[in-house]
Each structure stands twice: as structure tokens, then as C-alpha cells.
Amino acid sequence: MILFPAIDLKDGQCVRLKLGDMEQATVYNSDPAAQARAFEEQGFEWLHVVDLNGAFAGETVNGDAVDAILRATKNPVQLGGGIRTLDHIENWLARGLKRVILGTVAVRDPALVIEACRKFPGRIAVGIDAKGGKVAVEGWAEASELGVIELARRFEGAGVAAIIYTDIDRDGILTGINWAATLELSDAVSIPVIASGGLASLDDIRRMTEPEAQKLEGAISGRALYDGRIDPKEALDLIREARKGMIR
């Protein structure tokens, strides 16, 4: 069970969006590497990074910022946004990423995801971003008719390390995680699920530690951390206590 702090990159800066709208970006830190170090010093064990410009462009745009993050932290880093080819995946893993997140390509070319899992075992996650229960692609700019569970089940047995499920309708507005949809997905597949979008308070962290949610790998937090709505120490203490209970 992991709480992943998020760094979303736009034009080289650490930002948060509301509902995935690039025009509603709030800059929280102009130095993403410093933010990565701060999260590590606060006790977080992983880092979730998204190249927002890259998600729209279909290729890496904020590569220099990601490289700076990788140099700044010893924590494992997972990256999504604009990664669409095997060469691109291999390049990023060689540069120090622990895990690559594939979103649009999981819809457009699922065979590539399966091949990536074979070639890079344990290093590939699938990002499923949903609006109204349907999968969105190309930086959330395009809607599909594909259902979340339908897409997730395509990768059963492929070796996907995790599914990162984001409810776009809740992203960045602090309304709480969509637990009904997240747990429905977690129950429908054997792949570990990471909840994203809307995490608002310690109540969401507590919910994540309840027995019904213990199939989850964890949750991603952005605005709630940046705005001080969640105290890192309190959140991490809750998770550590829950882990002890699971071990027992």
C-alpha cells in the first residue's frame, strides 16, 4: 500500500490541473527536482510523474525536467505522458525510471503494451483515464466508447505491473476518490490498481486502508498535498499502521 505524491509537468514546471484542463493550471513549484527532493525528505517512497505537454504531443516534451527529477531523488519514479513506442520505453528505463505508464497506446495498440511487458517485466503500468465511465485518450482530449473494465481485462495475464485509474471528473478538485468505480475495477481484475483523481483528505487515506480496498496498490495525491490538506506524516503513519495489520 503506497501513497504516490504527484508531479505534473507543464512547460518545465510542477503544476496541477483542474479536470484535466491545461488552461486551468496552477504552478506549485518552478523547480520540479526540488519538489522531488522535498517529497523524499517527507518520507514518501515513490514518485508519480506526468509529462502533461507530452500527453498532448504524443512524445516527451519535459524530458529535461524528468532527468533532473531522476538525479534529485533516490526514490523509484514512474512516468506517464507521451510514451508511445518500445524504443521510447527502453530509453526512459535506461535513464533511470522504475516504471513507465502507457495510456493512449494501451487503447490504440494493446499489442505493444503486451510486448513491452514481455520485454521489460515488472516495469510497465497501464494508465486508464475515464470520464463518465469511458476511457479518454490523447491527454484526455479525446473520448472513446471503450469501458474501463473492458480495457483493463485486455491485459490480464500480460504482466502489467499496475493499472493507474484516474477519474477525470474528480481530478484536481478535491472531491474525494471515486471509490465505487475504483473498487469495481479492482475486483474485476487481478492486476493491482492505483487510485487517482480527487484524493482530498485523510478520510481517503483511511478508506484505502480498509479491508475492502486492500487489493489496491495505493493512491496518487497531488493538490491535497500541495494545498496542505493532507499532512504527509499523518498520511504515511496511517499507511504504515495498515501495513502492519496486513502482515499480521
From Swiss-Prot:
GO terms for biological process: L-histidine biosynthetic process; L-tryptophan biosynthetic process. It is an enzyme of class 5 (isomerase). CDD domains: HisA. Pathway: Amino-acid biosynthesis; L-histidine biosynthesis; L-histidine from 5-phospho-alpha-D-ribose 1-diphosphate: step 4/9. Pfam families: His_biosynth (PF00977). It catalyses: 1-(5-phospho-beta-D-ribosyl)-5-[(5-phospho-beta-D-ribosylamino)methylideneamino]imidazole-4-carboxamide = 5-[(5-phospho-1-deoxy-D-ribulos-1-ylimino)methylamino]-1-(5-phospho-beta-D-ribosyl)imidazole-4-carboxamide. GO terms for cellular component: cytoplasm. GO terms for molecular function: 1-(5-phosphoribosyl)-5-[(5-phosphoribosylamino)methylideneamino]imidazole-4-carboxamide isomerase activity. InterPro entries: Aldolase_TIM, His_biosynth, HisA_bact_arch, Isoase_HisA-like, Isoase_HisA-like_bact, RibuloseP-bd_barrel. Keywords: Amino-acid biosynthesis, Cytoplasm, Histidine biosynthesis, Isomerase. It comes from the Bacteria. Its EC number is 5.3.1.16. Belongs to the HisA/HisF family. This is 1-(5-phosphoribosyl)-5-[(5-phosphoribosylamino)methylideneamino] imidazole-4-carboxamide isomerase. It comes from Sinorhizobium medicae (strain WSM419).
